[in-house]
């Protein structure tokens, strides 16, 4: 029984030594690997391509709001950062010039030190990440092909022309549709159809009025009576 316990203790001790040895080996590899060190130092700043980004010196408002932001966040833990910034901006505007002056002096001192330390410094704002375009928003190839295949042809959309004026108007519309973009084809075709319908209706009304004015009134002939027999 004691031999079993001693063997179990020996196995546990061996496993513990192996774990400690692995931990030391991993830590040595992490410290001696330059890639790992570079990744730790430049984590979150991969856009600079390994160059240490120089921060701008803080202005008077940033110096004042540094402590005030922490105070407001502790007093209002549910408040978002954007709301805290709005509140701090309002409080900064309410301060007098005498209250702001110490922060302006400190900001000027920091700018002078920054200018001496980085004489060739130029402010380069970071580029905003462009949102990726969704493929669902782009027009599909089938819809583009369908728009290109839309034609204004008499075989597809036959029209009945009443006069030469309607024919010329439709010819001009065909030229305009052929030179315009495919998106406007449907609306132009609908306008042309409405124009032709109104023209045809107006022509038919004028023709009917002309016929009623030119033709004499027609009365049905009465049955022959004595007056018709003696007075033809």
Swiss-Prot record:
GO molecular function, one term: DNA-binding transcription activator activity, RNA polymerase II-specific
GO BP terms, alphabetized: cell differentiation; male sex determination; sex differentiation
Transmembrane feature ranges: none
Gene3D superfamilies: High mobility group box domain
Chain positions covered by the region annotation Disordered: 117-141, 170-189
Its job: Transcriptional regulator that controls a genetic switch in male development. It is necessary and sufficient for initiating male sex determination by directing the development of supporting cell precursors (pre-Sertoli cells) as Sertoli rather than granulosa cells. Involved in different aspects of gene regulation including promoter activation or repression. Binds to the DNA consensus sequence 5'-[AT]AACAA[AT]-3'. SRY HMG box recognizes DNA by partial intercalation in the minor groove and promotes DNA bending. Also involved in pre-mRNA splicing.
PANTHER family membership: SEX-DETERMINING REGION Y PROTEIN (PTHR10270:SF161), SOX TRANSCRIPTION FACTOR (PTHR10270)
Homology family: Belongs to the SRY family.
The protein's name: Sex-determining region Y protein
Originating species: Ursus arctos
